[in-house]
């Protein structure tokens, strides 16, 4: 019977023997394995057949990051082809998930097709090719394929979660750099049973209705009041939460004429919302409030700064779909994805709550804006 247990010093000789047989030119030393046992930033587990070591893995963690590294995963040749490698890998993923790691990353020699297939079948994606990564070896190529997997996945009905419980909120990618707000609203409309026949055309139509006209450069984005107006016109219940009475994004333009136009267009949206009884709360809307709204069956369009994700200070609308004790789960419509990403990797994207608190808001004055939408009672 196979068991996975934390490694201890009695396992070291067997582990080192298996390591040298697998990587004769680049074996991890016994001293290093001993350090992994003692370290609080490493998980080192062995797979035992009765009391014999037949496999092991090492996952390394770096303080203050959400990235875990699968440093080693080895299975004795005579036990391969029985699903045990998959079992080792799943256990490593579970351990990284317990430490709230967002990503698990590993390196595999380009010549090791079997290992690559194991990881790809488990949901890993190739993110980089590094030439001459491994030392010269007779057993494998020097080039390495860097593989990575997003670990936390939101599951409908999680005990400690709030959010969309009927079905997953569908994903949509914005078609232009300035329509993140409309794309977020279209996802909410679809979830609440009001999909559009031509999403790409409706995306632009919503932008025309909700745009602030100007931004620092290029086309203007969308303000919360304009998005709320568009959502109300399309049959959703709407509430706006902002932390200021001032017009948003004014600081992003310098010309007084542009500032005046932006103020006028936003005031027109505010007046429309007031005439139709839409609530505009001026408050410090935060995680506690958004969890309460998610628990009430709402979805939230939230304005974030992308600085904490890509180093660029830009306003960006996302759709908050769910939350639990550790993460805020968003559908991110951003179309500027990395080459290895697919749209599904931006669906229910887990953002650590501490990171979300930093990102929620835009500009030097940390202007917060949220549009809370739901079905009409």
For the regions a language model picked out, list residue spans one by one.
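Conserved N-terminal entry element of GNAT/NAT acetyltransferase domains
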Residues: 1-10, 145, 152-157
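Acetyl-CoA-dependent GNAT
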Residues: 6-78, 89-91, 95, 99, ...
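Conserved acetyl-CoA-binding loop-helix of GNAT-fold acetyltransferases
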Residues: 75, 81-94, 113-121
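Conserved GNAT acetyl-CoA-binding A-motif
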Residues: 96-108
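Conserved catalytic-core motifs of GNAT/GCN5-like acyltransferases
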Residues: 107-108, 120, 125-146
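Noncatalytic regulatory segments and standalone regulatory/sensor domains
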Residues: 115, 161, 295, 299, ...
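Active-site-adjacent structural segments surrounding the nucleophilic cysteine of cysteine proteases
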Residues: 150-258, 267, 283-284
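Active-site-adjacent substructure of cysteine-protease-like catalytic cores
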Residues: 250, 255-332
């Amino acid at each position: 019977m196979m068991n996975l247990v934390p490694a201890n010093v009695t396992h070291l000789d067997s582990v080192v023997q298996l390591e040298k047989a697998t990587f004769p030119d680049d074996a991890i030393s016994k001293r290093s394995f001993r350090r992994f046992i003692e370290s609080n930033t490493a998980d080192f587990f062995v797979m035992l057949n009765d009391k014999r070591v037949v496999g092991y893995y090492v996952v390394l963690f770096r303080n203050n990051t959400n990235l875990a590294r699968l440093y080693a995963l080895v299975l004795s040749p005579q036990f391969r082809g029985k699903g045990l490698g998959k079992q080792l890998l799943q256990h490593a993923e579970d351990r990284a998930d317990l430490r709230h790691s967002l990503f698990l990353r590993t390196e595999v020699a380009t010549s090791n097709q079997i290992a690559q297939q194991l990881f790809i079948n488990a949901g890993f994606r190739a993110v980089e090719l590094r030439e001459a990564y491994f030392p010269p070896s007779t057993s494998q190529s020097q080039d390495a394929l860097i593989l990575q997997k997003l670990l936390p996945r939101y599951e409908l009905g999680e005990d400690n979660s709030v959010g969309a419980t009927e079905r997953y909120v569908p994903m949509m990618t914005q078609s232009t750099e300035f329509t993140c707000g409309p794309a977020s609203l279209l996802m909410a409309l679809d979830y609440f049973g009001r999909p559009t026949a031509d999403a790409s055309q409706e995306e632009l139509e919503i932008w025309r209705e909700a745009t602030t006209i100007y931004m620092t450069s290029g086309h203007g984005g969308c303000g919360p009041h304009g998005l709320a107006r568009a959502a109300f016109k399309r049959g959703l219940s709407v509430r706006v939460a902002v932390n200021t009475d001032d017009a948003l994004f004014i600081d992003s333009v310098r010309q007084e004429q542009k500032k005046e136009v932006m103020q006028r267009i936003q005031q027109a949206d505010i007046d429309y919302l007031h005439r139709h009884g839409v609530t505009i709360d001026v408050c410090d809307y935060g995680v506690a409030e958004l969890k309460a709204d998610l628990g009430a069956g709402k979805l939230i369009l939230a304005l974030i700064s992308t600085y904490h994700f890509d180093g660029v200070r830009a306003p960006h609308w996302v759709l908050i779909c769910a939350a639990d004790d550790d993460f805020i789960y968003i559908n991110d419509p951003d179309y500027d994805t990395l080459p290895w990403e697919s749209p599904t990797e931006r669906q229910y994207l887990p953002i650590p709550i501490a990171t979300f608190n930093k990102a929620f808001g835009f500009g030097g004055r940390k202007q917060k804006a949220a549009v809370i939408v739901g079905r009409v009672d």
